[in-house]
């Protein structure tokens, strides 16, 4: 029936894209975007907005796309989102905005993400920028980290007239958008750098190569540098491991390190001297989006790649689209299996993995059925590289050098969900530094909430 099926999106062929790092999805052209926008029912009580962590007025921007008012659509989106070109490319829209779309009850939900991406890409190609505050309000705010939480918080504060400086530890802004997500999913120069420039166009200053807690401490920013409030959006870059024998062998990487070498340091490009393992057979342990990114990157470097995950396909935490693309490209999924030991040769290099088969038992605290080992089912798989993708936690450098900043047992900063306020007066936090590794869009939502909290704090303090 008319309107039940969404307009398909063009992509690189799997066999072709598995050999390059160019973006997989081409996105909509103007005609496709207008046709897809026409499927929107423009609901008065739009459930899609309730599924959006940054509260974009989805029906309003889609209505403008339908009428080919693409610039107005962009301004509607950019009122709420500092990173519209990023969201669709990496966000779990099937469980957020599109998961709430009423069209999805009897057909395909409206492709909200693809429409947002189209508008953001159109704006970039036509030189359209977000609207800047008319004047500064005289208050200085420091933002630590230039990832999705930091960029969103900084952008929202700048729109309110605050003088905002972002301090970034690395040499390039973008945080996890720059170092953690591969080029074939999120182009760095075309998309990430352009989104960073849009935030700078709002008046935000970005200082790179500044490690807060080492180069300068939060207390010094507030007491000596004149910053009246600080937002911590430093992410969660400390990788977790399994604690099994052999993890210290040569050829074992955290997904964080493996992806950083490729994404930020361009190990995949000729002309760069960044060392990286070009394994012939790679085992990636884990089932999230980061595991898919690491596996698909290793594939493009020429490896046979196996994803080893202790639960089944239904329990994979990765986006369905990422799993689908990985399968299309030839990634092998070894599900309901778990490593018990990394096998090491006499020279200290990985030579294989000992794996035990699993079955699902009763649900655990997350609601997913717990994996249980099957006795006597162990076997060995040859490989020369193992990539651990088991999540990350915040680096304790900031919390350990900031007096009065409370953390929990996972070393995450304790902050209120609605405002991002921490235990230290004037200091706010959000994103992975608070929750541990989560999604880009949730980090953006936290940055947005903190910007509102900081504005309320400084407005009340100065009245």
Regions found by a protein language model. Give the residues of each.
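Ferredoxin-type iron-sulfur electron-transfer modules in oxidoreductases and energy-metabolism complexes
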Residues: 17-36, 57-89, 106-133, 262-263
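Feature captures the FAD/FMN-dependent oxidoreductase FAD-binding
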Residues: 135-136, 140-144, 196-244, 341-354, ...
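A conserved FAD-binding loop/helix module that cradles the flavin
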Residues: 433-460
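Glycine-rich dinucleotide-binding loop and its adjacent helix/turn
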Residues: 119-135, 192, 197-211, 239-301, ...
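Rossmann-like dinucleotide-binding cores of NAD(P)H-dependent redox enzymes
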Residues: 163-166, 170-201, 205-207, 295-341
């Amino acid at each position: 029936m008319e309107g039940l099926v969404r307009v398909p999106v063009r992509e690189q062929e799997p066999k072709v894209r598995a050999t390059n790092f160019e973006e997989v999805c081409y996105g909509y052209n103007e005609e496709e975007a207008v046709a897809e926008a026409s499927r929107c029912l423009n609901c008065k009580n739009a459930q899609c907005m309730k599924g959006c962590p940054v509260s974009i007025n989805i029906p309003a921007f889609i209505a403008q796309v339908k009428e080919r008012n693409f610039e107005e659509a962009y301004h509607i989106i950019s009122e709420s989102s500092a990173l519209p070109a990023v969201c669709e490319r990496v966000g779990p829209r099937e469980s957020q905005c599109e998961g709430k779309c009423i069209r999805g009850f009897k057909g395909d939900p409206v492709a909200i993400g693809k429409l947002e991406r189209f508008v953001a890409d159109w704006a970039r190609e036509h030189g359209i920028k977000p609207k800047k505050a008319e004047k500064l309000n005289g208050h200085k705010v420091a933002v630590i980290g230039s990832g999705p939480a930091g960029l969103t918080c900084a952008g929202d504060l700048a729109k309110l007239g605050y003088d905002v400086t972002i301090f970034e530890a690395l040499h390039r802004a973008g945080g996890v958008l720059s170092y953690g997500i591969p080029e074939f999913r999120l182009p760095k120069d075309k998309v990430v750098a352009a989104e960073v420039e849009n935030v700078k166009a709002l008046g935000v200053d970005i200082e790179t190569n500044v490690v807060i807690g080492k180069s300068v401490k939060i207390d010094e920013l507030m007491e000596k540098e004149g910053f009246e409030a600080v937002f911590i959006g430093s992410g969660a870059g400390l990788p977790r491991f399994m604690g099994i024998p052999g993890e210290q062998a040569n050829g074992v990487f955290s997904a964080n390190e493996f992806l950083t070498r490729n994404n930020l340091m361009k190990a995949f490009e000729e002309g760069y001297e960044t060392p990286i393992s070009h394994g012939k057979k790679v085992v990636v342990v884990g089932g999230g989006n980061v595991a898919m990114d690491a596996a698909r990157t290793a594939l493009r470097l020429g490896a046979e790649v196996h994803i080893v995950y202790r639960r089944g396909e239904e329990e994979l935490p990765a986006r369905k689209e990422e799993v689908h693309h990985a399968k299309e490209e030839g990634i092998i999924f070894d599900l309901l299996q778990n490593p018990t030991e990394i096998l090491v040769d006499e020279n200290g290099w990985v030579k294989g993995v000992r794996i035990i088969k699993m079955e699902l038992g009763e649900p655990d605290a997350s609601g997913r059925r717990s994996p249980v080992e099957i006795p006597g089912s162990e076997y060995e798989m040859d490989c020369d590289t193992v990539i651990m993708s088991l999540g990350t936690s915040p680096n304790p450098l900031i919390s350990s050098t900031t007096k009065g900043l409370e953390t929990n047992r996972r070393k995450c900063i304790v902050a209120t969900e609605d405002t991002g306020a921490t235990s230290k007066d004037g200091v706010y936090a959000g994103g992975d530094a608070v929750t541990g590794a989560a999604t880009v869009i949730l980090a953006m939502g936290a940055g947005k909430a903190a910007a509102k909290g900081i504005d309320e704090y400084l407005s009340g303090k100065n009245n």
